[in-house]
């Protein structure tokens, strides 16, 4: 059986009003971005230090590089810059790693002014996470 990539699912009406911003750079980030692209026909922004080739060569990802040792302030500054560059978009912030999920929880007040945040608050995250 062969797969015809030209017949993959396409959104009925592409959503150019949303912009997923995904923190990280591994294959899981690629998977999240691909799901958004297939469901809504939108581009995504990857914010990471060394995104995988699947992200950097993707036709639906733009990449914003940050240092591998970026502080909360530096990462927050990058995300606020992205928000300022896209005032007409509904920004959705996603993460695929506990470190970045904790970052979002710590900075929820500032980030929620610009991004939809499908994350629990820090208290809930600390109570439920046991790794």
Q: What spans do the regions from the language model cover?
A:
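Preference for protein termini
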Residues: 1-53, 84-90, 95-98, 110-111
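Conserved N-proximal alpha/beta basic substrate-recognition cap immediately N-terminal to
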Residues: 56-131
């Amino acid at each position: 059986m062969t797969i015809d990539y030209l017949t993959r699912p396409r959104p009925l009406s592409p959503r150019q009003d949303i912009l997923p911003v995904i923190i990280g750079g591994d294959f899981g980030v690629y998977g999240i971005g691909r799901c958004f692209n297939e469901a809504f026909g939108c581009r995504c922004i990857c914010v990471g230090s060394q995104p995988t080739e699947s992200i950097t060569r993707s036709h639906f990802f733009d990449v914003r590089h940050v240092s591998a040792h970026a502080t909360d302030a530096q990462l927050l500054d990058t995300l606020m810059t992205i928000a300022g560059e896209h005032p007409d978009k509904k920004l959705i912030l996603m993460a695929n790693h506990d470190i970045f999920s904790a970052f979002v929880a710590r900075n929820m007040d500032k980030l929620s002014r610009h991004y939809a945040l499908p994350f629990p608050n820090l208290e809930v995250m600390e109570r439920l996470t046991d790794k």
